[in-house]
Amino acid sequence: MSVTDFSIQIKEGTKKSHSAAENTSFVASFLRGVVNKESYRTLITDLYYVYSAMEEEIDELQDHPIVGHINLSDLNRVESLEKDLRYYYGPIWRSLIDPSESCTQYVNRIREVAKDNPILLVGHHYTRYLGDLSGGQILKGIAKKALKLEGNHGLAFYEFDNIPDAKAYKACYKGILNHLDLDQKQVDAIIEEANYAFKLNMDMFNSLEGNWFQSLLQIFISSIFKKK
């Protein structure tokens, strides 16, 4: 049995959370083109840990009757994030990064559901990957301009080299969701988890807001002293 309108249910069921995530101070500032390199590379670092956990767990569950269907290598982000981290931190980037506390909580949740109730990974997968695919090119343009980047350096995260038509791919992805062998109770649980995934993302963004504000304050104070 499959719930043929699952893709509609999860979209409608996460609308409020989606809107709330977009309205965190950090994301709102990012969308206005107000972002500094330090906060951005911290974001990339946290996303690296999140995607590493998600892709590792989903790969481990490739034979799972539900999770196996969302093991879509075209969407994988870890390799792209590694390129960006190398750009922002240099060749020894692995020794220079650590996850934030909110990121660690996010990663722990991914590991937990993978072990205890793997179908909930569908909610996490939907929350991150479909969002990346939907807004990737817009965010890429904003980041490129705000950070004054040349070419595509530092922007690999937004590149989906194996997906030439994002709109068509999203339609295919929604079709996969609609054909998963789930009952309504399971669908409801996945939607609840997707909303929790949005909260975990918001917690990460809110921690970045502190970094962003601190950097802005430092610039402001520096400019005052220069004027003196």
Which positions does each model-derived feature cover?
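Metal- and O2-centered redox machinery and metal/ROS homeostasis
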Residues: 1-228
